[in-house]
Amino acid sequence: MKETFIHPTALVEPGVELGQGVSVGPFCHVQSGAIIGNDCELMSHVVITGATTLGAGTKVYPHAILGCDPQNNKHKGGPTRLNVGVNCIIREGVTMHKGSDNARGYTSIGDNCSFLAYAHVAHDCDIGDYVTFSNNVMIGGHTSIGHHAILGGGAAVHQFVRVGHHAFIGGLAAVVSDLIPYGMAIGVHAHLGGLNIIGMKRSGMERKEIHNLRHAVRMLFDRTKPIRQRAQDVLAAIPDSPTVSDMISFINVDTKRAYCTPPLDAAHGGAGHDSDED
């Protein structure tokens, strides 16, 4: 394992926990209490507050600022944290805020995530593994992003919204409602534009499961019954599909937001814009 390197112009305060093989570049500032895992690299002009933990192998590009106070007037300055997983890529100008003391108290980032230039993660968010934020993505406080989700450039997600795993949000979309697993949100305000078929294929999902999800979405969003009742109808019609069960579990969780739905003129709430099916 390589030796830890700290550039002469960097400020690493006493009380920082540095792993083996860490590289701290020019003009970085790492505050007391920060935990930097093995083989992390801070390129230059990076600020890591003492409320931050970086998992091993994470690389942070210039002018990123991690772990500052939440932009939440209810936060009273109590001890909270930002926890970043292993092998993440955090590009130029990214900001991530720690949690609030009036909420769950920490912001969590999963493993193997990529945050492209100037993306923003607000307080108390929960982000899964293998998530991609494209340039200038912004998510509000208390937002939940599932594993393998992709957020296109300039997309904005309202506070408290839940985005399911393997979902896709198009560039410049404004998402104000919960997005189902495997769903695709497009537009301002964003609507459900179908399923993330390309992402499902890339993940190796079987064709049968893709068909099951298509059927489930058509049933869920036909607007003839309350959505929780429709969800039970879906389980009865497609009882043995793990992906459909995941989707229905997402629907059945209590939420502060509505659901991202197809446009009113979409026939039977169908899966428009997901035509990349074999």
Swiss-Prot record:
UniProt-listed CDD domains: LbH_UDP-GlcNAc_AT
GO molecular function: acyl-[acyl-carrier-protein]-UDP-N-acetylglucosamine O-acyltransferase activity
Keyword Cell wall biogenesis/degradation belongs to the record: no
Gene3D superfamilies cross-referenced by the UniProt entry: Hexapeptide repeat proteins, Udp N-acetylglucosamine O-acyltransferase, C-terminal domain
Protein's GO biological process: lipid A biosynthetic process
Subcellular location: Cytoplasm
Catalysed reaction, written as an equation: a (3R)-hydroxyacyl-[ACP] + UDP-N-acetyl-alpha-D-glucosamine = a UDP-3-O-[(3R)-3-hydroxyacyl]-N-acetyl-alpha-D-glucosamine + holo-[ACP]
Cellular component terms (Gene Ontology): cytoplasm; membrane
Keywords carried by this UniProt record: Acyltransferase, Cytoplasm, Lipid A biosynthesis, Lipid biosynthesis, Lipid metabolism, Repeat, Transferase
Principal location class: cytoplasm
Pfam families from the UniProt entry: Acetyltransf_11, Hexapep
InterPro entries: Acetyltransf_C (IPR029098), Acetyltransf_C_sf (IPR037157), Hexapep (IPR001451), Hexapep_transf_CS (IPR018357), Lipid_A_LpxA (IPR010137), Trimer_LpxA-like_sf (IPR011004)
E.C. code: 2.3.1.129
Pathway(s) this gene product operates in, as recorded in its UniProt entry: Glycolipid biosynthesis; lipid IV(A) biosynthesis; lipid IV(A) from (3R)-3-hydroxytetradecanoyl-[acyl-carrier-protein] and UDP-N-acetyl-alpha-D-glucosamine: step 1/6
Subunit composition and interactions: Homotrimer.
Main function: Involved in the biosynthesis of lipid A, a phosphorylated glycolipid that anchors the lipopolysaccharide to the outer membrane of the cell.
Family affiliation: Belongs to the transferase hexapeptide repeat family. LpxA subfamily.
Protein name: Acyl-[acyl-carrier-protein]--UDP-N-acetylglucosamine O-acyltransferase
The species this protein was found in: Brucella canis (strain ATCC 23365 / NCTC 10854 / RM-666)
